[in-house]
Design a protein with these regions (language model features):
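Class I SAM-dependent methyltransferase Rossmann-like catalytic core
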Residues: 1-19
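Conserved phosphate-coordination/catalytic loops
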Residues: 3-4, 89, 127
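Short, well-ordered alpha-helical scaffold segments within catalytic/effector domains
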Residues: 6-10, 95, 130
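Hydrophobic helix-cap positions at the C-terminus of alpha-helices
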Residues: 16-19, 101, 136
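Conserved SAM-binding loop
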Residues: 22-119, 131
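Short, solvent-exposed loop/turn segments at secondary-structure boundaries
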Residues: 120-124
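Short alpha-helix
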Residues: 125-136
Length: 136
């Protein structure tokens, strides 16, 4: 994980994950840890599940289908995706699945590069700009 992505997540956590008393269900999509993980920065009341399409550090569930998340509708408080959407062929299918599992008051933290160089990690399909977030 790039330091800028980690810092963005830490800002998100500081501003939005402020409840220290309630159990907060967090799902990270693309959770395989290469050099740093958000899991290391979560609080004791955060119930973390990491999902990815490959086995690895911080991967609790290996997905058979990257567009089907194994969670009930409206069951997750927070979904996090850091540097994953650019590698997802059909990111809009992932987005719809995220909306399905999020509680109505749930939060989605998306961090995706807009100006990084080509970096094929199975594939490199998209770049996201500020208007992308508004459109989603």
């Amino acid at each position: 994980m790039h330091i800028s992505a980690l810092n963005s997540f830490l800002d998100f956590k500081k501003n939005y994950l402020t409840d220290k008393n309630s159990k907060i269900k967090i799902v990270e999509i693309g959770s395989q840890s290469i050099n740093e993980s958000i899991k290391n920065h979560l609080d004791k009341n955060h119930m973390y599940t990491g999902v990815d399409i490959v086995k690895g550090n911080n991967v609790d569930i290996v997905l058979d289908d990257p567009y089907k998340l194994p969670f009930e509708k409206d069951s997750i408080d927070v979904v996090i995706s850091i540097s994953t959407f650019e590698h997802t062929e059909f990111f809009w299918l992932s987005y719809l699945e995220i909306l399905r599992i999020l509680k109505p008051t749930g939060l989605f933290f998306l961090n995706a590069p807009s100006n990084s160089k080509y970096h094929r990690h199975s594939s490199d399909n998209w770049r996201f700009y500020p208007d992308s977030s508004k459109a989603l």
